């Protein structure tokens, strides 16, 4: 009975739908990046098969038309995948930061009873307009703390995660103050 108590909560549906919609949008924005990673793995597989078929690889005759065709195909897949990864990351990161305030907005709107999934996502985009780079810089400043968590096998997370989340909450509160002054 207690294991299903979460689903009885009146906020569950709004929370679930909002977070699902956020993840779905971010998935769509990450498709070029994922396609680039797929092609990168495929080009790696092609290179491995080539080396298996040509054990004399370092001294292979590059004037052979078959080998030349393979190298051109490999280069196309490899550089195409790198291009897709770079472009995909450039597309994904601004969208990631546009939706970075969704969870905090959700907490605020659930408390007053006006949480709607699409509205919460739109509000997050509005709040972050012009402030995505500042949030990116904040995340870069917190990167050493994540590294410390990693090298301590998660033990340091007990004291570091509250610091990281506090910084993100202070950023959100400051963002609300700035946007309220502008409106």
Segments from the language model and where they lie:
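Hydrophobic alpha-helical membrane segments
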Residues: 1-183
């Amino acid at each position: 009975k207690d294991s299903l108590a979460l689903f009885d909560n009146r906020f569950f549906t709004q929370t679930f739908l909002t977070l699902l919609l956020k993840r779905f949008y971010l998935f769509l924005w990450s498709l070029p990046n994922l396609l680039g990673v797929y092609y990168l793995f495929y080009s790696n597989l092609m290179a491995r098969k080539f080396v298996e078929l040509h054990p004399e690889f370092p001294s292979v005759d590059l004037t052979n038309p078959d080998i030349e065709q393979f190298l051109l195909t490999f280069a196309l897949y490899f550089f195409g995948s790198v291009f897709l990864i770079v472009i995909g990351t450039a597309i994904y990161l601004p969208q990631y930061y546009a939706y970075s305030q969704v969870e905090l907005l959700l907490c605020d709107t659930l408390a007053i009873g006006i949480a709607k999934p699409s509205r919460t996502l739109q509000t997050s985009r509005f709040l972050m307009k012009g402030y995505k780079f500042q949030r990116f810089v904040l995340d870069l400043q917190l990167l050493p703390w994540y590294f410390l968590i990693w090298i301590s096998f998660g033990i340091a997370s007990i004291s570091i995660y509250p610091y990281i989340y506090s910084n993100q909450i202070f950023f959100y509160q400051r963002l609300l103050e700035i946007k309220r002054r502008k409106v």
